[in-house]
A protein has these predicted regions:
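Contiguous, structured surface segment used for ligand recognition
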Residues: 1-153
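Flexible loop/turn segments at secondary-structure boundaries
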Residues: 19-21, 62-64, 110-112, 169-172, ...
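Gly/Pro-rich turn-and-neighbor structural signature
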Residues: 38, 135-146, 207, 215-226, ...
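Hydrophobic faces of well-ordered beta-strands that scaffold small-molecule active sites
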Residues: 160-164, 195, 201-204, 231-235, ...
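Catalytic domains of carbohydrate-active enzymes, especially glycoside hydrolases
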Residues: 180-210, 216-219, 223-232, 282, ...
Length: 518
């Protein structure tokens, strides 16, 4: 039985043709191995007499994988052409000078990255290793044999991620103190966290920051694209421009005009959208469509429902035409979303007297993002007649919320059985294209976020038959994140604290308590 020793003497085979983001993540995994064993793997570019090695590559970007497949030493057909899939194969004598190797092959960039991070998990490294400084248990060596051979699944949900929202003062002050601003140095650990959790999709912070300007310049977007993080913008920020950008460029004499008003200022607003699409067109994005008022407010607040629907219809026509001109004449090949949140939900469904946007040809191929009620209960799900919509459905879900009538933030209050109930139902009703959760400042939300993303990645495992699966999830999450620092006898107590704490907060959050509550 071939086996590979993770520890002293291990090498990482580094191809010149490897994708830059994959190389960067391989460096992170080498650091993980050093955390566990105390020894950092050596990077090699040939066999060089190495006994054991990790070989990694991406189909289409790896002569090494091509050669091994041609020689019959590895099989790639099980992952070829499959979104974000990877395989593990422990083999003997892959290259001259290498006795045994673990070959990590990815169908695409993220597949390879997930495979590399899966190696970290196999040796006991938590996805929170750097974000929360969760140190693994020391082991001199870890032996892996061909029992780790596997082919990963196609993720249950295509785009899985989170929204950094209402980020001041917590996330904002952290970014300012450690990095100076929400620049690429700040986003690097955020992207790492997302990818270690097998997410792939992000709505960046937007209260007083501009993702595509603060890198500085496009460095945030460049880094995201290098690492395979799919960027988008929140529900009220169309065409890859953050909500604060218009206030920076508006004014009398500005080419963008001085009114966030598509009726009064159509040329300026269209130019604003055009320039955003042009700026970010070379990156992997999901483009937000539609329009709300400034600062996430209702648009045309005193207009009729019919007038609002017609406005959004005209906006969609303009935005889709811009996408045809700038990105792809076949607009249906471009990932797009529209988020029906708050008052815009009525624009989609309409009323008995006024037809909504359901079935509008401008929404063909657009992912229709439904939402919860800001407090973790989904509002609507697709009917059987709606589920064939080209573009599919997504869900915008809240684990943190700043706004009326009651905010809840800065405390991780997510009760997993509630997430299970709402999101497994959403999946069963066909909401499978995008899952994104509002997690405020990220900090304190890691437990709920971990389950949300694991559920989105593999609903067959973490959806289970009923909510009892969340008890099993909590136990394994506690072992992974507290097992190195606490005695085994303490872990059930930690599980109980987390479960009871979140259960009680699900019944009554701090912000909703007053002198007359009881």
């Amino acid at each position: 039985m071939p086996q590979i020793t993770i520890g002293k003497g291990l090498s990482f085979y580094e191809e010149a043709q490897a994708l830059p983001g994959v190389k960067r993540v391989a460096g992170m995994v080498k650091q993980d191995i050093e955390l566990v064993t105390g020894v950092s793997p050596v990077g090699i570019t040939s066999g060089q007499g190495s006994g054991c090695a990790v070989l990694y590559g991406t189909i289409g970007h790896s002569p090494m994988l091509d050669a091994l497949e041609a020689q019959g030493k590895i099989a790639l057909n099980a992952i070829r052409g499959k979104w974000e899939c990877y395989s593990f194969q422990v083999i003997e004598n892959p290259l001259a000078g290498i006795g045994t190797a673990l070959v990590i092959a990815g169908n695409d960039k993220r597949g390879t990255i997930y495979g590399l991070f899966h190696l970290s998990e196999l040796i006991g490294v938590s996805p929170l290793v750097n974000w929360n400084h969760v140190l693994p248990r020391h082991q001199d060596t870890v032996i892996l044999d061909d029992r780790v051979n596997m082919v990963s699944r196609v993720p249950s949900v295509k785009y899985r991620g989170f929204f950094i929202n209402d980020e001041w003062p917590a996330f904002g002050n952290w970014a300012k103190t450690h990095f100076g601003s929400m620049n690429a140095a700040c986003y690097a650990p955020v992207f790492e966290l997302l990818l270690r959790m097998k997410g792939n999709y992000l709505w960046p912070a937007m209260w007083n920051s501009n993702f595509s300007l603060d890198g500085p310049g496009l460095e945030n977007a460049v880094l995201a694209d290098e690492l395979g993080v799919v960027m988008s913008t929140s529900h009220h920020e169309p065409c890859m421009r953050s909500g604060q950008e218009y206030s920076m460029v508006r004014g009398r004499g500005s080419i963008y005009g001085d009114a966030w008003d598509y009726i009064a200022n159509p040329e300026g607003i269209t130019r604003f959208w055009r320039d955003g699409l042009t700026r970010n067109k070379d990156f992997e994005n999901v483009i937000t469509l539609g329009m709300r008022g400034e600062n996430d407010t209702a648009i045309m607040q005193h207009a009729t429902l019919e007038e609002n629907i017609q406005l959004i219809r005209n906006v969609l026509k303009t935005q889709n035409q811009l996408i045809r001109e700038i990105i792809n004449p076949d607009v249906r090949q471009v990932p797009r979303q529209i988020v029906f949140f708050s008052e815009t939900e009525e624009f989609f469904y309409g009323s008995k007297e006024t037809p909504g946007l359901i079935g509008d040809p401008e929404l063909d191929g657009v992912t229709l993002m439904l939402s919860d009620n800001n407090h973790g209960s989904t509002r609507t799900l697709p009917s059987p007649e709606m589920r064939s919509h080209p573009g599919g459905y997504g869900m915008y879900y809240h684990m943190d919320m700043h706004g009326g009538p009651h905010s809840f933030e800065w405390v991780g209050a997510t009760y997993l059985p509630k997430v299970w109930e709402e999101m497994t139902a959403a999946y069963e009703y066909g909401v499978r294209e995008i899952w994104v959760t509002n997690i405020g400042d990220i900090g304190t939300q890691e437990f709920g976020l971990s389950y949300f993303l694991d559920l989105a990645y593999d609903i067959d495992v973490w959806g289970g038959q009923d909510a009892a699966i969340t008890t099993q999830y909590t136990a394994q999450w506690v072992r992974r994140n507290f097992g190195a620092a606490f005695a085994p006898a303490d872990l059930p107590r930690i599980e109980g604290i987390i479960t009871d704490y979140t259960r009680l907060l699900a019944r009554r959050k701090h912000e909703k308590m007053g002198e007359n509550t009881y």
